[in-house]
């Protein structure tokens, strides 16, 4: 069993919890995911099974989220899972004020990851240090790209909430956006809900709940996604049999393609052969997978 799954991660499980369950159900140790979701977050989690795990690093990095930001409340995790640091409410806050500050969160921005995150510092993950009560030195900011940030809805009240859709680069922390927006407004804010609606070609409307994947395996109907779809953002290069034979031996072959990487296929059989680095008129094998 090899290929990709478009998993709809439920709330309450870590991404690793989902992978562990799939390993038990599918009887396959080589299973990985294409982008961590926090335990409270839900939505698209791309999963690779078998040798497809070698292709995870080539998945499209674009992500789309639907997030709900709650104002007037701050926590140490920057979401509702953490301890409350400030609770003053923000009943006077209106959407007009919020929209003025949202512009600063579009385009290329700098953000500091949450204290509770998987970022490594001093050889350990930040969340491990935070849970042990270790004093964390200044966390280095990261540059991320916010391609689009759209207001979907506004809910006034003592703790007003803003629902937004964000298209962003990989490595973007939506919790940091919520926290920093609250800081800019002077009200404090935290992330109340997060749903990932897209990760590269994997869309929420085509995703499967974990229970459905488990039931499908029992029935022999697990809908695996092939590399043509999973790597659709990469150019496809088709090799004639003589060049395909050289490729399968790990040899560089002549060829042109756009971008840094390309899917490689054999012309006659339409077999997927792997992924190449595109280098000035030649294709350098990076991953050779002749029968995926």
Swiss-Prot record:
<dbReference type="GO" id="GO:0031119">
    <property type="term" value="P:tRNA pseudouridine synthesis"/>
</dbReference>
<dbReference type="GO" id="GO:0009982">
    <property type="term" value="F:pseudouridine synthase activity"/>
</dbReference>
<dbReference type="Pfam" id="PF01509">
    <property type="entry name" value="TruB_N"/>
</dbReference>
<dbReference type="InterPro" id="IPR020103">
    <property type="entry name" value="PsdUridine_synth_cat_dom_sf"/>
</dbReference>
<dbReference type="Pfam" id="PF09157">
    <property type="entry name" value="TruB-C_2"/>
</dbReference>
<feature type="active site" description="Nucleophile">
    <location>
        <position position="38"/>
    </location>
</feature>
<comment type="function">
    <text>Responsible for synthesis of pseudouridine from uracil-55 in the psi GC loop of transfer RNAs.</text>
</comment>
<dbReference type="InterPro" id="IPR015240">
    <property type="entry name" value="tRNA_sdUridine_synth_fam1_C"/>
</dbReference>
<keyword id="KW-0819">tRNA processing</keyword>
<protein>
    <recommendedName>
        <fullName>tRNA pseudouridine synthase B</fullName>
        <ecNumber>5.4.99.25</ecNumber>
    </recommendedName>
</protein>
<dbReference type="GO" id="GO:0003723">
    <property type="term" value="F:RNA binding"/>
</dbReference>
<dbReference type="InterPro" id="IPR032819">
    <property type="entry name" value="TruB_C"/>
</dbReference>
<dbReference type="GO" id="GO:0160148">
    <property type="term" value="F:tRNA pseudouridine(55) synthase activity"/>
</dbReference>
<dbReference type="Pfam" id="PF16198">
    <property type="entry name" value="TruB_C_2"/>
</dbReference>
<dbReference type="InterPro" id="IPR002501">
    <property type="entry name" value="PsdUridine_synth_N"/>
</dbReference>
<dbReference type="GO" id="GO:1990481">
    <property type="term" value="P:mRNA pseudouridine synthesis"/>
</dbReference>
<dbReference type="GO" id="GO:0006400">
    <property type="term" value="P:tRNA modification"/>
</dbReference>
<comment type="similarity">
    <text>Belongs to the pseudouridine synthase TruB family. Type 1 subfamily.</text>
</comment>
<dbReference type="InterPro" id="IPR014780">
    <property type="entry name" value="tRNA_psdUridine_synth_TruB"/>
</dbReference>
<keyword id="KW-0413">Isomerase</keyword>
